[in-house]
Amino acid sequence: MTRAYGRVVAVLLITASACATIGTHAAEKKEDPRKAVIERSRVWSPTDIASKDLKTGPTGPGAFQFRETVTCKYLDKKLSGNSPKFACVIGEDDEVKVKFGGNNGEVYGEVLATRLLWALGFSADRMYPVNVICKGCPEEFLGIERPNDESRFDPAVIERKMDGHEWGNKGWSWKELDQIEGERAAPRAHRDALKLLAVFMQHSDSKPQQQRIVCESKAKWPDPSTCDDPFLMISDLGLTFGRATRSNANEPSGVNFKAWAEMPVWKGDEKCVGNLPKSFSGTLSEPEISEAGRKFLADLLMQLSDRQLTDLFEAGRVRLRLRSPGVVDSGFATSADWVDAFKAKRDQIVQRRCA
């Protein structure tokens, strides 16, 4: 009986130990490295703002000149999102995404917002305003028909992704910015500056899929769970420079001069709470901004010259967009009108104190 009892106890102990080991391994396997990556992410890099040519935009491989004519072959491929867009192939294998349509606010907003982020050091995808000649595009796209099964799209923009590799496929939520910590990570001043810039631009559609975690290293890493240099960036900025709306509607939210010019940067006269209404899918609304974040963004914005601001709105071709889209007799705002509105809103940030 004693030996039998001993064997039973031994078996039970071994079983318990094995279960504990399996449980530990299971917990290790379930551990998501995502939090660790976000905790040490950056959102801003030092840059020479005065040297930025906002009309030309980012140069280098894959860049296009302002309003360059680009010929491509239509690629029948489903793209995410609701705005007019299509995939197209330049040459043999250079696949690009084309956003198009004079009534599509994202055609203008993408250029304005990405150029501004790029100039200030927050990084973004590269968006180029071009004239696209598409071979084989469907008639329902309503391009201007040309001979040889070609159609022209103007205004249009071509997207080039930010250098690096996307980490994961979930994007990031604005609430996750508050998880960042550590010496290599973005300080609160940088994070609050990015939040305030999103308020300034009225970034309406802020769901996680509109932001990406990018590993800036050009070489692919062997272990997809690691990333030595994570950077949090905003990847879809079409619904900006209007007024953030519950439904992320194109006309009020995407480059609407009247709505943007009339929207105060701050909510109320005392606390530093950004005036950004929450959209149905958004993860950023009415953020509280620190004095360090306000000052950091103010110092960056003040480095932009009037020439650069004019170039920004010329690149965005704002003269093609009604002051109040949907209101046909609202007329068209000039680049000078937009520059004045930009500077007035910038002054609201510069003159505020959040201490």
Language-model segments: what does each one mean?
Residues 118-122, 199-202, 347, 354:
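Sec-exported extracytoplasmic/periplasmic mature domains
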Residues 219-355:
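C-terminal catalytic region of ATP-dependent kinase domains
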Residues 61-172:
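Conserved ATP-binding subdomain of kinase catalytic cores across diverse folds
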Residues 134-137, 213-220, 318:
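Short regulatory "switch" loops immediately downstream of catalytic or recognition motifs
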Residues 11-12, 16-76, 92, 315-355:
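Regulatory N- and C-terminal appendages and interdomain linkers associated
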Residues 105-110, 172-258:
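Conserved kinase catalytic-core segment
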Residues 1-9:
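Bacterial N-terminal signal peptides that target proteins for export
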Residues 20, 73, 89, 138, ...:
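Sequence contexts marking disulfide-bonded cysteines in secreted/extracellular proteins
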